[in-house]
Amino acid sequence: MIDTAHLDTNTVSEHTKQWLEKAVIGLNLCPFAKAPHVKNLVRIVVSEARHLDGFLEDLDRELQLLGNTPASELETTLLVHPTLFPDFETFNQMLEIADDAVVENELEGIVQIAPFHPDFQFEGTEADDISNYTNRSPYPTLHLIREGSIAKAAEAFPDASAIFDRNIALLEKMGHEGWDKLDIPRCPFPHHKPSENK
């Protein structure tokens, strides 16, 4: 369960940015992420919707913006909601609707969605398995990715399937102590409490 008391959108955005810089880019979990971040082409949006329908309206808006904006101006979007999806099961159920939104906005084959959640868990793993941290984030997050960007990045990383295996091996080598040393706000290993001074 996510403790989201006393949060504001600026704090949520900053925590997400630190996760992006320290884990996704810092550990090179996604080799494609650094370039757009350095070029300031990553949009972080914190939804304040009070219900699912409102969140899906925010998703529609961000999908349309991404679809109508050149990649040279906006490469990718992180849509974050700190309170609406407190458990992974609820979040996971929403993903099918989110994928439908891509189709409804006529962006199938153009944009895809990658999910991240504080309690993300791959099928067949234990909750505290370090491999789950490839997709764990401070808050429930939808990463809206241009498929053209993925194809372009794949040219530089032809063995893209090896990235996941490399990430798992890296996290297993780091272990929970190594992960916690990254000091990512609201994203500690399960048996640790989040730092109160974040």
Model-predicted segments: where are they?
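Expand to "…catalyze enediolate/carbanion chemistry for C-C bond making/breaking, isomerization
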Residues: I2-K198
